[in-house]
């Protein structure tokens, strides 16, 4: 299959999930779109090197996480985060972002540290198996289970604080 058809298939199959994961990682819709686009460009350029040791979804998710991390590392991102907080306080921000920010669960996930947030996103939003998550984060399955359980407990604490209570 030619590279352009391959990338189109990847975008159709994983595009929405990758964009959602990048948004949850970056907390900014425009940056998430940039990260998702960069993910598919990198996937297209590296597809012939993909050795199929893991699933395609695991591979492209790893690329998306790395693209998101690269954006986070930039000084521009750090500066724009301060501006973003001010922007979110205004009445003219993106309605998609506003909807996601108002969602209590999404907001609670955003309050988790990066590692815990990554685990929750990969497990619940990307619907990856523990084995696939372990490959992505470079840990054993048992360690991944322990970390996921710890992230769940932290998320539960945050949700209880905002009024969800014991359920």
Where in the sequence are the language-model features?
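Pre-recognition alpha-helix immediately N-terminal to the DNA-recognition helix
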Residues: 6, 17, 104-107, 117-118
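Short, small-hydrophobic-rich alpha-helical interface motif
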Residues: 18, 22, 32-43, 63, ...
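C-terminal flanking helix
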Residues: 19, 40, 113, 117, ...
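Σ70-family region 2.3-2.4 aromatic/basic alpha-helix that recognizes the −10 promoter
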Residues: 40-44, 54-77, 152
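DNA-recognition helix of helix-turn-helix
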Residues: 65, 137-161
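Internal acidic/polar
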Residues: 70, 78-110, 129
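A short pre-motif secondary-structure segment
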Residues: 119-123
